[in-house]
Swiss-Prot record:
NCBIfam families, per database record: PRK02958.1, tatAE
Any GO CC annotation of this UniProt entry: TAT protein transport complex
Membrane topology: Single-pass membrane protein
Protein name in UniProt: Sec-independent protein translocase protein TatA
Main location: membrane
Record-stated family: Belongs to the TatA/E family.
Keywords: Cell inner membrane, Cell membrane, Membrane, Protein transport, Translocation, Transmembrane, Transmembrane helix, Transport
Residues that span the membrane, as ranges: 1-21
Summary of subunit composition and partner proteins: The Tat system comprises two distinct complexes: a TatABC complex, containing multiple copies of TatA, TatB and TatC subunits, and a separate TatA complex, containing only TatA subunits. Substrates initially bind to the TatABC complex, which probably triggers association of the separate TatA complex to form the active translocon.
The organism of origin for this protein: Nitrosomonas eutropha (strain DSM 101675 / C91 / Nm57)
Length: 77
């Protein structure tokens, strides 16, 4: 009485198929698979957010001192 044999599980499966039908079982399986996939993508997104370095607060300009000096020299000529 402690464990079920393969025949017990086959009878239970047959009753479930008769009660719910194969279409509902297929929809249930695809819904469950979609939920698992969404959960995995959500966890992947959370891991990517944690691994990205925080943005720096320094503002970097595109000009260097050398280019500013060259611009001043060109305006003098």
């Amino acid at each position: 009485m402690g464990s079920f044999s393969i025949w017990h599980w086959l009878v239970v499966l047959a009753i479930v198929v008769l009660v719910f039908g194969t279409k509902k079982l297929r929809n249930l399986g695809s819904d469950l698979g979609g939920a698992v996939r969404g959960f995995k993508e959500g966890m992947k997104g959370a891991e990517e957010e944690n691994t990205q370095p925080p943005p720096s607060h320094q503002q970097v300009t595109g000009h260097s001192i050398k280019s500013e000096i060259e611009e001043k020299d060109q305006t003098k000529v």
